[in-house]
Amino acid sequence: MSAIQGIQGVISQLQATAMSARAQEPMPQPTISFAGQLHAALDRISDTQNTARVQAEKFTLGEPGVALNDVMTDMQKASVSMQMGIQVRNKLVAAYQEVMSMQV
């Protein structure tokens, strides 16, 4: 009998928690524009490119603490991010051309 009462107590606590969660007003979501996200992505690509360039310059000048594998990793990250940016651009251009060719 006490086990059933214990389960009922847990159920009532869960129901109270669910009711209080429903009573809370949802947090307003920040407005995120497509142009803003695109600009942020381009900034990240630019930052990756700049980081790779700086690492390569440091390695070329022989600064201590800059290993070849770090330079190569940064260069590959920059290359992959640039290729991704190019592919996104290509898809956006194709989508734009498709929308513009639609008849209204």
Curated annotation (Swiss-Prot):
<dbReference type="Pfam" id="PF02049">
    <property type="entry name" value="FliE"/>
</dbReference>
<dbReference type="GO" id="GO:0003774">
    <property type="term" value="F:cytoskeletal motor activity"/>
</dbReference>
<comment type="similarity">
    <text>Belongs to the FliE family.</text>
</comment>
<dbReference type="InterPro" id="IPR001624">
    <property type="entry name" value="FliE"/>
</dbReference>
<dbReference type="GO" id="GO:0009425">
    <property type="term" value="C:bacterial-type flagellum basal body"/>
</dbReference>
<dbReference type="GO" id="GO:0005198">
    <property type="term" value="F:structural molecule activity"/>
</dbReference>
<keyword id="KW-0975">Bacterial flagellum</keyword>
<protein>
    <recommendedName>
        <fullName>Flagellar hook-basal body complex protein FliE</fullName>
    </recommendedName>
</protein>
<dbReference type="GO" id="GO:0071973">
    <property type="term" value="P:bacterial-type flagellum-dependent cell motility"/>
</dbReference>
